[in-house]
Every structure is written in structure tokens, then in C-alpha cells.
């Protein structure tokens, strides 16, 4: 924080300011100079290392003060009246945030001392408790004779390859990787000391009663919540579009799942769970069809969906008749920092009488933290001792302290006006990108990409899905139930019309995503004719423009019918003899024809309309696997057989068949959908779908694991 911004209305600095700058620079500070209010604000938006703002009387007023506060309400601001300035001070125009210094009364050294003390106070204020304690510990440079064995990186420096590794990451990474033996830093497992302060700080930031830092991802956070909330022998309501970590919970614990069935549209975009699925009548009916099921004690709902659809969570919290609800919100840790998400989150609002609400966040996914950083938030009466046992069961006794600090810093970054600005900038950038795609489409001489969104996106808000709208492609939409997040942008490629019907020609989206990947642009998810991109706080204008440029480049190459070798070099290298002289339009039409052959839109609806039959719960199926009571079966032959592993294609990574389930004639469209994915990969090298739980054989066929008859 050595950068200082000086705002002065005169291009030519007076002798006093020149002298002050010289004194500051001798103290190691770098001075940025702005000559008007807009330039001051531009500097502040683009240089987060500015530790203080100095303004002369001729440039400062109350309006500028309010604009600075809106950007960063913690930043120290000084109004200087230089010794060579005779302008009288209008204290009514100064504002309440800034500190006035009449430089006639102080030496340069005194003024610099005031500025430096303010910067130190600013740094102290914005640094959260655990991170502050960790920084202080590293500064002390203590000698240790405990773990970790690299001893602040010293061990790496004794080896050539270790030195390369050390130099790549830098010394503070290793100095801050320390043992749990350091009592002054408390304990993550015991939630004591600075670790406890960090979790209390995070809870305050996210409007929770309790928050827990999880250092091995939301996959683990989900299991911790489930192990606490659902005792063995109980029944749990669970979103069928759940993350596979929740399937792993079902495999670990002997509990009975009853599935809440969401919708999908012709694009394969995951829809929400209809309101009727949450009613007592429908839940009661479900229980009669599941052997051993009792009234559920807990519910798990994915919010938002992978594709960015939020629920009206206030209504679900008030009406769903269970003791606790877990909103798996791994993909939306930013929702507490913009009013557009009010009423659509787990931690929003007050406690719900006689219920405990859990919300899990993948801090690393769309905030700024190291990979695997996650949080559990709780609202309601929690047995903290029992929860702590479930937490310790899944938490390492040697947590990586830099990851703990990054989780806390991610929360700190979102506090106050700075966090609101980060969030607003992301929202504005996402909506601007959406509009740019629509503008290009409107002016295109032939085809162009489209965006999955309402016609009018002028207002930055979560757009409600209405039954009368056609754009979303879902059937039977409930009023005031589902909302689209502006941050998650789904691009559409040609191939499906607005009614969800297949067109004669098409450009399957995996061609585009592979093209983008060859150019260093990685998308989040690719469906048959859709691509999901995320406008997180780390996306800037340069990245957004790079994506737009790459999309335009693909269109140009496609329209010119360039060779596959030119457009998709890595795909070409998968099988040069197959792709020799093949053109991109031929490849696109080939994959599109296979999709048409299987009538994908109808297959999508059918495959997720009837679930497989649960013969045993996932826990029992996994126990049989551990005992070796399973065997291989070709994928196409699995009708009528009990599946041993979960089967899920990537994308989207949502289980289609759970352990212990059987595909019947009624649910056979699920198998047909999987076979279609396999057929595309068999026909076109480089386009194989990764199907977890199905194993590709040398002959190109797939095998799955089934329970022995």
C-alpha cells in the first residue's frame, strides 16, 4: 500500500507540493498525480494498492468525497491546503469523510507522519483477523523443529528441483505454510483463536449465525452438513440434479433418498424443481414408492442450478416441512453482495422458526480464494459440539494456512462499498456482454450466436421465468419461483429453434468450445447447442473482448468452410487420417445429424421424466461393491440390472443413474441418451464424452458395474 494518489487541479505543481512529494518518495511511497475528479476516480478503480488520497482545495468537494466513499469507504482521504494557497476553506463543502490539513501549521515530516499513520490504520482495518495473525507470525521469522518438513521452504533450497519449485511460488507461500503446533494462531479443528475470529468475521460478512472454513472443497462441506443433519436410518429429500458429492454422502451413510425431480429443456439446460415437488401431498406420494422411507428430516436443494437459475428461497424456507434445509450454493458465493439476489439465497433474511438453514459456498469458484476453499454457513439453532464432530471427521489435522487465509480474505474483499463495487462491475460487464452478442446477431448477414435470456435485459436484475415466455424452453413454470442470474451467460449455437425443434443444419456447441480452448479460452460447460461462461469478479474487459473476438473468428472460419485442421488442430491430431481434407461444416453437420437421428429434444424430456427404480439405497449398493459382489456389464445391456456406481456424463456432472438403481423399460430413455453420447464419440474422434461410471473398452463399447444377480 505504498501508492499515494495526489489530486491537484493545476497542471503545474507548486513548490510546497513538489517538496511534499519528494519527502513521501524518500519514505518509499510512489505518487500518482491526477488533475481532475474523473482522473482521481479512474485511478481508484484501477489501482487497488493506493493507500491514501491527497487532494488540494481546488479539486475537492462533497460530491467527490461521496464518490470516493462509494468506491472504498475505508480509504483515508486528506484535503491539503498548501502553504502557497490563499483560498479560504468552505467546511460545508468538505464532507465528513476526509481529514483537513492546513499545511501552514505543520512541517512536511509531520504531514507525512499523519498520512503514514492513516495508511497503517487503513491496512489494519481491512486485514481480517486470521490473515493479520498469520502475517505477524511470518514477520517474526521463528525457528521451528516441528512440521511441515520443508521448514519455511529451507528444505527446498537444498535441492535443484526444489529451488525451482521455491522460486516459482515465492518465499511467503512457504513461510506461511506452518504447523498446527503454533498456538498463537489457534486451531481450525477446535475453532479457537484467530481461526475462530476468522469464522466469526465470515459469518458476519455472509449474514450467518455460524460459518465454518472448509479447506477441501464444497464436496466435503456438503458431506459435513449431511452427516450432521441426517442420522443413519433417516430419510432425506434431495435434488435429483445434486452434485456428485451428495451421492457420495448417500454411499457413505445408510440413509434413504427421496428425490425432488427438476425439469430440463430441449437444450439440456437444468431447470428448477417445480413448486408442487415441495408440497406435503407430493412428498407423501413419493414416500409410498420408496421402500423403508419415512418422513424426511432434511432437504438438499441446488441453488442456483448449474446454469444460473435461482429459487425463491424465502418461500421454500417457509413452506417445506423438514427440520433443516441445505442450499448447495457452491456456484454463487457472491449473492450477499448485491440487492438483486434478495430472497433468493439461503442466508438471506432472518431465522426461520424451528428450522436450521445451511448454505455451502465454493469460495474459490467465483470469489477470490485458492482452489478447494469453501464455506459452510448456518442460520438457526445448531448443536455446535455435534456439528464439530462431523466437521472434524472430514477435516485434515494439517490444514494449509494460506488457504484458510485466502478464504477469509475472499470475505474481506466483499465487505463494504468495495465489495459492492466488485459485484456491480461484474454484473454490468455480464449484461454489457449479453447485449453485445445480441447486437452482433442483429447485424449478422447470416447466423450468429444467441444468448439464453429474456428479450429485455436493460435492467440489472435476476430475471424471472414466466410461463408465457418462450425463451427459456421449460414447461409449467411456476410464478415467482425461478430467476436467471445475469452473471451466468449461456451462449446458444444454431441447431435448435425457439420452440426446441431441431433445425436442418446446426453447429453443435462442442465445436465452438474446442475452438475456444485451442485459443486459451476455457468455458465452464458445453451442452449440445449451448455454452456456459461465468462473469466472475476476476473477469475484466480484456477477457470479455477476447471471448467476443474468438467467437467472431470462429464464425469467419465456419462461414469460409475452413478445414478441420485449421479450425480445430487438436481434434485433427486425434485422427489425422479421419479428418484429412474434412471441412468444418461437414464435421458440424455430421454431429448434428447424429443428434437429429436420436431426436435429442424429445430424448432430453423423456430421459429425465421417469427416474430409474431404486432397488436399494446407494449405501447398500456401495457395501456390496466393497464386498466384491459386482460384475461388469455392457452399457447397452444394463436394463433390468442393478447399477453399482453412479453414472454421470460431463457435462454437466449430474448423476443420471444412482448406485442401487435399475433402468427399466419405462426409464430406458436415460440409456438411449447415454448411448447417443457414446455414438458421437465413436463416430468422431476427439468428441468422446467423459461418462463417470462407464468405462470405454478397446472395441469402443462401454461397460458399467452392476450388482451380481
Task: Please name every model-derived segment.
Residues 172-220:
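Conserved N-terminal alpha-helix of the aminotransferase class I/II PLP-enzyme fold
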Residues 78-83, 326-329:
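ADP-ribose/adenylate-binding Rossmann-like module
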Residues 24, 34-46, 56, 62-69, ...:
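Conserved PLP-enzyme active-site core in the AAT-like
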Residues 212-214, 299-302, 531-536:
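Short glycine-rich or small-residue beta-strand-to-loop segments that form or flank ligand, phosphate
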Residues 6-7, 80, 148-150, 239, ...:
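Short hydrophobic segments within beta-strands
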Residues 2-14, 236-239:
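Short hydrophobic beta-strand segments
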Residues 4, 12-28, 35-55, 68-76, ...:
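Non-catalytic terminal extensions of PLP-dependent enzymes
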